[in-house]
Amino acid sequence: FLIGMTQGLICLITRKC
């Protein structure tokens, strides 16, 4: 839930998935 959203945001911001 929250962890998934946070990881998604970091992925979008840093472009590092």
UniProtKB/Swiss-Prot annotation:
Compartment list: Secreted
Q: Which GO terms describe its cellular component?
A: extracellular region
Keyword check for Disulfide bond, yes or no: yes
The alphabetical list of record keywords is: Amphibian defense peptide, Antibiotic, Antimicrobial, Disulfide bond, Secreted
Q: Name one GO biological process term.
A: defense response to bacterium
What tissue expression does the UniProt record report for this protein? Expressed by the skin glands.
Residue pairs linked by disulfide bridges in the UniProt entry: 11-17
Where primarily located?
secreted
Q: Give the similarity note.
A: Belongs to the frog skin active peptide (FSAP) family. Brevinin subfamily.
Q: What does this protein do?
A: Antimicrobial peptide.
Q: What is this protein called?
A: Brevinin-1DYe
Identify the species of origin.
Answer: Rana dybowskii
Kindly list the organism's lineage.
Answer: Eukaryota, Metazoa, Chordata, Craniata, Vertebrata
